[in-house]
Amino acid sequence: DSVPLYYNDVRNFGTFKIALSKNALDKKINSLGPDFLKDGWGPDTFYNLLKKKPNKTVAEFLMNQKNVSGIGNYLKAECLYDAKISPHRFCCHITTKESDRLFYACRRIIQLSYQTGGATIQNYRKPNGKKGLYSQRFAVYNQKTSPCGNEIIKEQTLDKRTTHWVPAVQK
């Protein structure tokens, strides 16, 4: 049976590849870092992964799907804010306590985003045509002030993406 496949990437951030064999698919999947939505790994593994990238900023680390998978730009901003970590910090300077905070922030925020259908940014829609509701919960991404009233800075970080962050909170 033939099944139509639709791919709409209005923001031009995505890629679409077709694996022609199970081996090709397995190779790609095995190249990805651990998924925050899956059990079987935890804060100790996360800390060890961070320490393997001492010369990368935490923003670069989170956005590289070979390190950890499932984090995009809005999740990066929200998770770093929740963990109170600056996107400019290098992985080698992240303490165990900070790494634990970041791991649990990522897991919690990604789960909540997934449960609420993701974030509708611009004209994004889920396959059923509905908007994701997580954008209504943004603390810093696309906001002017943080929940505690601090100014949010928007700047390009070393991951080459615009990052929303709060210097008064994130150290």
Per-range role (PLM):
Residues D1-K171:
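Structured catalytic/nucleic-acid-binding cores of DNA maintenance enzymes
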